[in-house]
Structure formats: structure tokens, C-alpha cells
Amino acid sequence: MKEQTTMPNKLPKLEGCSYTDNLSTVKRQISSAASAARRSPAEISLVAVSKTFQADRIKPILASGHLFFGENRVQEAVEKWNPLKLLFPDVRLHLIGSLQSNKVSEAMALFDVIETLDRPKLAQAIARERDRTKQCPNLLIQVNTGEEPQKGGVLPDRIDDFIERCQTEFDLTVRGLMCIPPLGEEPSLHFGLLREVGRRHDVERLVVTSGVSSVRSFNS
């Protein structure tokens, strides 16, 4: 199972700095953290969370060469990114918000990665759309490692069965696992749980996140 870290950030504008300046600052921080961890910065990708940002505020970041972006809502993303992708066809979009079954067709046409697969009904809808279009984005299963009722994701005691159903009943390739550890708890415990699950099911990528201002892992 491979791990590659990315650090999503909503790129709040720092005092006296542009968004591109802020992006450069975050990338320098990532490079320093990678060196401290004896990892190559090339293994790390930054997913800029662009939800609620208008296209004119995203274009300078795209023009700077950044290609990885995360969105929460399908309809907002479709309206924003369909025109932008004509100008920047190499951009890679991650759906990081909950996906409703009736939005699957639009989501699969737009996103390169869906990070929030978490229930059989959604898996079935994705499989049907995959069969119809013969295409499928990378799929990540969200695991609710903290068993928090306000968060989406599969509970730990159900994750093995859900992965098996995705792989056998729906013939879906699970590319990774994602979790959002509870605030105030040691994240490594939750990341360790994902690693164990991933090894049991030969999932090749591990995705871990502490939200838009902290750490996310993804191997794109």
C-alpha cells in the first residue's frame, strides 16, 4: 500500500499577500516537512480547497501551475469547473464532500477522484454509471474512524464488509481510504486503523485528513 501526503488548504489570504503568494508559502512548508520526515517533496501533492471561491479567484492559482483542487458540492463545482477545465484541461478535481446518489452522473463526469464513498446505495449508483459510460474516477472510501454521528463515513466495524461488497457485488476498484480524525485526538491512531484495513484488503493508497487546514494523504 502506497502513501503520498497532500495538505489541503482553503488558501486564506494572508495579510499583504496574494493567493499565489500564500500557495508558495504552503508549498515551502510542505517541502520543509517532507525533508524533516526524510521524504521526497515529489511524493506530496497539495489539494487546494476551492469551495465557495469564484472562478476569477481560482484562475491566478491555476495560471501559476497548480492543478489539484477539492470541491464539496457537485452543482457548484459543475458550474465553476466546466468552463475552467476548457482553459486548464490538466486540472485534477477531488470531490471531498458527501455525494448524493442523484448527483452521481454529474459527479463522475467532472471529478477525477471521489473521496467520500460510504454506503451501498451510492456504490450501486456509481457502478451503474460506470457500466453506462465505461469510465470511473478514482474511488476512496471514507471511514468514520472516530464514530462521530455528525460525520459521514463507514463505521470501523462495518468497513471490511463494505469494501468486500464494493469489490465483489459492485465490481468497483477501491483506490484508497480516507478519514477525518476527531479534533483533539491523536491522529496517528486513526491513520493506523486505515493502514490495517488497507493491508487486509490490498488497498493501494491511504488517504488521511484532518480537515482543510491540516493533513491529507493521497497518491494520485
Please name every model-derived segment.
Residues 2-216:
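Conserved alpha/beta-domain cores
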Residues 219-220:
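C-terminal accessory segment of soluble enzyme catalytic cores
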